[in-house]
Amino acid sequence: MDTQAFKRSLHHSDRYNRRGFESPTKRAQALEKAYQSNLIGSIRDNGYLFEHGRLRVKLAEAFGFCWGVERAVAMAYETRRHYPKESIWITNEIIHNPSVNDHLRNMNVRFISAEKGIKNFSSVQEGDVVILPAFGATVQEMKLLHERGCHIIDTTCPWVSKVWHTVEKHKKHEFTSIIHGKVKHEETLATSSFAGTYLVVLDLEEAQYVANYILGKGDREEFLKRFSKASSQGFDPDRDLQRLGVANQTTMLKSETEEIGRLFEKTMLRKYGPAELTEHFLAFNTICDATEERQDAMFSLVDEPLDLLVVIGGFNSSNTTHLQEIAISRGIRSFHIDTPERIGDQENTITHKPLGDDLITEKNFLPEGNISVGITSGASTPDRVVEHVIHKLINLSEEKAFVD
């Protein structure tokens, strides 16, 4: 499919909207009323520091809702106001935050059901309104909805759209797109649908495996088996790894994406020499500013003298998971929670998700004596949720009893 031609056609349709329905001022006011926090605002004004009794809280200097998330959430809410009686669907979670998605359900916005990763659009009818989430949607989904006569409200983050343009550029010039991302993540699924030939690598280890193969140090059958679900149809590593362009899922760890880019540039330089490098490797810049800012702020936060660190965000949120990885890399006790309710009301307990593991409940997670707690949150977490977490910590810090 000529994805660029399809997008041009879609964007000119009177059933497609990517600008929303309300003025930026009204949109900001509605979002502020729903999610902003006076407490968090005052903590920002106080150098991101809050102290109460024996509790000292240090916030990361960049956290929470990014511009792309704010835009997507606001557009989703105003869509219901604009279409008060119509059937409204959304192709996936608007963002990876349970409270925001629950609010949409309460507004009678229905989520497209999926079984084993396959979405069922059979209930969506002509004239229905369908919201595309901040992560975007695959070009095949857009085409299906457009041909069915749906009204499409596109809240895709512009940074994600930028990555789509990058992989389309790769396709136009017959380069294979190496996509640094999680193969089942909604954003990576959407990005790969706009690519031509592509290969998804999860991390530096997988990228090194691919680089070794390029340099003649791999087994073809093993390669094909390893990337059978992470490559374009008919992918041939002997044919398709000769001309490479790099792109990424915008929420991946910035430093790792940059390292992967350098690895493939050096690999192609080694194989083809400096005179032919530009014929075999395309430089890239698809790292999201907001992701970069939050990760940089996290690196600064972990340099603080902290007893523990709380990372707030959806358990399926890629950008939140990478913030947790930074804390772990520094050996700091850290707890990834998705809602304030994971912290006990009176008992000194926290139910959290260790990296790559299931939920566990830890007793006596707040130590005795003075406590220094670092807090950050993913790009899909409202300030009001962070405020509720701080109130939970205040209450527990005032409690005397520890759990046996």
UniProtKB/Swiss-Prot annotation:
This is 4-hydroxy-3-methylbut-2-enyl diphosphate reductase. Isopentenyl diphosphate binds at residues 96, 185, 317-319, 380. [4Fe-4S] cluster binds at residues 66, 157, 288. Keywords: 4Fe-4S, Iron, Iron-sulfur, Isoprene biosynthesis, Metal-binding, Oxidoreductase. Pathway: Isoprenoid biosynthesis; dimethylallyl diphosphate biosynthesis; dimethylallyl diphosphate from (2E)-4-hydroxy-3-methylbutenyl diphosphate: step 1/1; Isoprenoid biosynthesis; isopentenyl diphosphate biosynthesis via DXP pathway; isopentenyl diphosphate from 1-deoxy-D-xylulose 5-phosphate: step 6/6. The keyword Methyltransferase does not apply. GO terms for molecular function: 4 iron, 4 sulfur cluster binding; 4-hydroxy-3-methylbut-2-enyl diphosphate reductase activity; metal ion binding. The active site is at 187 (proton donor). GO terms for biological process: dimethylallyl diphosphate biosynthetic process; isopentenyl diphosphate biosynthetic process, methylerythritol 4-phosphate pathway; terpenoid biosynthetic process. (2E)-4-hydroxy-3-methylbut-2-enyl diphosphate binds at residues 96, 185, 250, 317-319, 380. Its EC number is 1.17.7.4. Catalyzes the conversion of 1-hydroxy-2-methyl-2-(E)-butenyl 4-diphosphate (HMBPP) into a mixture of isopentenyl diphosphate (IPP) and dimethylallyl diphosphate (DMAPP). Acts in the terminal step of the DOXP/MEP pathway for isoprenoid precursor biosynthesis. Its cofactor is [4Fe-4S] cluster.
